[in-house]
Every structure is written in C-alpha cells, then in structure tokens.
Amino acid sequence: MTTDRRLEILRAIVDEYVETQEPVGSKAIADKRALGISPATIRNEMAVLEEEGLITQPHTSAGRIPTDRGYRLFVDKLSTVKPLSAAERRAIETFLEGAHDLDDVVKRSAKLLADITKQVAVVKYPKIGDSQGREMMAISGTANLARSGEDLGNTLSPILEALEEQVVLLRLLSDAHPTVHVTIGSEQPDSNLQSTSLVTVGYGSDASLGILGPTRMDYAGSMAAVSAVARYVSRFITEGGK
C-alpha cells in the first residue's frame, strides 16, 4: 500500500514532470522538496511506486514519469483544486460579460478556456425549452495540440480526426457530471483519445464543457478553470445574460 511519504514523492514527480517535461530523478526531488529524506531513500520509495504501476522509466532516461494510474491517484488523492487568482476571475467575468446572446457566450467560453489552460476547449450548447434539434458544440484551441506534439507523438492525427468528427466528444460531454470529472489516458472509452485526458463539468440543461489535452497536464489548474468558467456560463443562462 502506498504510504503518505510515497504519495508525497508521487506528487513531486507529477509536479516536476508537468512543469519540465523531463523524467524526474531522486536527486531532483531531494533538491527541490523538503522531504527530509536522502536521495537513496527516495530511490527506494520510487522503486515501490514503480512496482505499484504508478510511475515508469522511459527507455532513454534514468528518471521516472507518471503512468495513467499515477495521474489518477494524483487527481483523486493529492490534487487540491487551486483557486483562480483575483485577476483570472476578473478576466473571465469581463470577457463573458461582453457576450450578447447564448451563441456568443458559448463561443467566448470555449476561447477563454483554451487561452487559460493552453489545451483544446469544448463547450456543448444547452437545450433550450423542448428543443429536439441536433446537439451542437464549440471547439477552440486545436492548435494547442500541435504544441504538445512531443507528448502525443503519432496519436496526434487520430485525435485531430476525433475533434473534427465531434461525435466522440459530444458523447463524452453527454456523460459530464455536475461536479468536475477527470478521465485520464487509458480510461478514455475511445482508443484514439487514450493519450489524452479530459476534464469536464455540467453547467446547465444537458450542457457541459471541458478541456482535452495530453495526460501531462496541470490537472489542478485545469480543474479550477473548467469549474470557474462553468459557474459564469451557468449564471449567464440563469440570469438571461444580465
């Protein structure tokens, strides 16, 4: 069973890897984290984390990177949703206050989420009244995937195809929870998206929004941004844009 100390080491590996994109070694953790233990002890604990399938060693490196299971444990047990700064909250409010109708607010929300998280943002339109029309969504930030080419490798093309078709994303967004939900890597039901993570939340009548990006993402920041934008969009709909 993973101890509190190992969880702290896992947190350090995730944080460092997300920030640097480089596999993480025991010395880097000892130098940057006040854990009060030696690099040798950290190496021993990392060996256990590797046995538990939470981290893995790339072929060309002495360091370790998180696995999908490691990210899942990080999100479930370690990651606290960090609040947005006052400046970020004001930026969201100001940007969305300029919207003059539902279509505008949905498109603005997608662009805003993509800009904040540097990932692909998807926003599903809410149902209006008894409308039985086809489901619609707005997508922004597709170019951000190209900047993640090293993370996504040869899976980039299938991901772009899935985004273009939209059917897969609409199905995933239809399963969105009223609270922020994270689907990581191999948990994705569509095999074309299993090098990505999806952070989603519902915000209105059969409506949802979220971001899609490589599994090496800032989960805490992405969860905070998705939650905050959903609150503002929900308020816009409830108050009729006032």
Q: How does the language model describe each region?
A:
Residues 1-11:
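Short alpha-helical segments that sit at the start of domains
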Residues 1-2, 37, 66, 84:
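Alpha-helical hairpin
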Residues 9, 67, 211:
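Conserved RecA-like P-loop NTPase ATPase core
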Residues 10-15, 197-200:
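Contiguous, well-ordered alpha-helical segments that form the cores/surfaces of helical PPI scaffolds
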Residues 15-19, 23-77:
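N-terminal helix-turn-helix
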